[in-house]
């Protein structure tokens, strides 16, 4: 296996050298061609997908998991649309982000270039195969994909279509490669290929991400959990605060940017919490409050220390009443995951300070935490959300799949 | 030990929360105060330094190594000047690098924030203690320093002065901490502190850097070797090319941005190489050439495969004659270290293509490779040169010790 993975790595490196020089017109054509080929291969894709589905059912996988594997007509159409959208994004490669002149006349600048070879290790959903590859290609990279065993046939079929599309548009097929086995050994081999893979992006459960982070020799862009907070200040518009909290908790509770803990200023708690709690209960949300919350909200369960750390990903909410914004920020700093926090307030000074002092990947004023997403923030697409601070912090779009090199234009400058 | 390192990590995290909120006036004052305190403590510093020097001599360290340990009046003055220069750099923290408005009216931007806690593991030179700490502080971070055993007393004395200066200017002393022992166990413990240290920067020999890269759980900003190339095109001005090559090789041969391999276009080799070789020999440079070079340059040694990979860090130069720029770029891609490459040419098209296609941390046209340095490129100061592509590629200044978070300003936006 080691040998096979090494060969893939070397091929990826070669392909990356080629891809770095490809112009945007050519990359757009390839991505649009991928979309056409996926639309044209619906029967073959669904046949491969059926194999995975049948195996998953036979293995006794829970229905929700089986469902996430399914490539029906709607998912395939979304895939093709996604490819066309990525094709239309503006090309980050070659952009000169800044340029300045030194006293000796040397003109120095920074130019955006692809990262090189990107490794993506993911579980379950086969659409990642297409979405992730598209973004890597757009940014001029080569990609090595290693999907989960449950989606093996689907991933294989999709990767073959992407590779064929590259060849048909005159690009190197090895710009997209899928690891041919699903055993864990292959993952370990990949994680040691620091000379061939410039960055590894794990996508999946916390176990997978920790495994990758602990074993990778190359840099890892990773996303642990999202314990997101909304702080309702005493100068908040209560109606706006209720709408934002409801949206942040209920609109899609199973995702990383959903609110998990609500912090309420003591000055508004008496007014705000009773109707808010009623609305949450009507929406089926289980509430777990601090002592002060329980004095205001009848029949609220007692929150224990673990609740403040919890990423429920479910219709459960922890609630705490705090004396002021300082206490709210302290709570966020202590228990939060640096993912997404929002303040609802009409007070300029506090909005300003919350924005400055809360060090999460997205900090919002008067808007729902659910906006922490590449599409929603205007990046066009995303390959994940980084909660570590190096290179990228927050949603990663096509630009985060590039880096910058320095360039210098001289007329004979020497160092003295 | 594990316990002591963990305590340092937690203190650093606390200090980092504080430092992130400190305004630039305050940070400047602290850095200028450090400079004053170093100037005022010359006797104590030299006393501590003498202990290290005596131990190094007793241990039989080579004279060059002993010399690098020495903190004489000149080095101390440079340290103080460095502190004042860093104090005057513009503060990157809080800068909003971009802002845009989404169709729903949400205003989204990116704001520069400190990285948090930075770990620096270094060898030998005690001035790193001061230079590195200053840059970390300026960028609003806390830093944990782990210096080499040879400079133990010097580092301890300097770190104490920095910590005292922080306290005297009302900042948390734990923004600068020095690991109190020099055993390797402590390094391993540090490398596992991913929850407390956001990034690790190793500075020293290749062994140290590999050890850190292989064992760190947090991201690492690292610098392997610099196998730097100059390509002399057939449309180069021969005099300019000679001056640039001489500067790149001879001005300071022992550093990472010195030229190690010279690539010469076949169309200019007959004219260019004989006087160039003569000039190199006059400067004491040993030449190792390819077959074609040896046909032009008398008494040139034969370069073998390893020479193309070599970082000599000495007055030795590998020379290869290539048919065209494509062959030069292929050579650089195959044997280079992505550090620094220069082209000397009067041809616009080739200059343009070389700039685009060579993927090194600094690519120059008509200037010496020796400019790959934070001061020379105008970053004000540097904490090292990164040859890996994530987060930073090339010299790292104060801005590279920050990251950006997303901010969003709304008036009640919800996700639908």
Curated annotation (Swiss-Prot), chains A, B:
Pfam families: Aldedh
Cell compartment(s), UniProt: Cytoplasm
EC top class named in words: oxidoreductase
Pathway stated in the Swiss-Prot or TrEMBL entry: Amino-acid biosynthesis; L-proline biosynthesis; L-glutamate 5-semialdehyde from L-glutamate: step 2/2
Record keyword Metal-binding present: no
Reactions catalysed according to its record: L-glutamate 5-semialdehyde + phosphate + NADP(+) = L-glutamyl 5-phosphate + NADPH + H(+)
NCBIfam families given in the database record: PRK00197.1, proA
A GO molecular function held by the record: glutamate-5-semialdehyde dehydrogenase activity
The family this protein is said to belong to: Belongs to the gamma-glutamyl phosphate reductase family.
Gene expressing this chain: proA
Listed name of the protein: Gamma-glutamyl phosphate reductase
Species assigned in the record: Syntrophobacter fumaroxidans (strain DSM 10017 / MPOB)
GO CC annotation terms, alphabetical: cytoplasm
Main function: Catalyzes the NADPH-dependent reduction of L-glutamate 5-phosphate into L-glutamate 5-semialdehyde and phosphate. The product spontaneously undergoes cyclization to form 1-pyrroline-5-carboxylate.
Record-listed E.C. numbers: 1.2.1.41
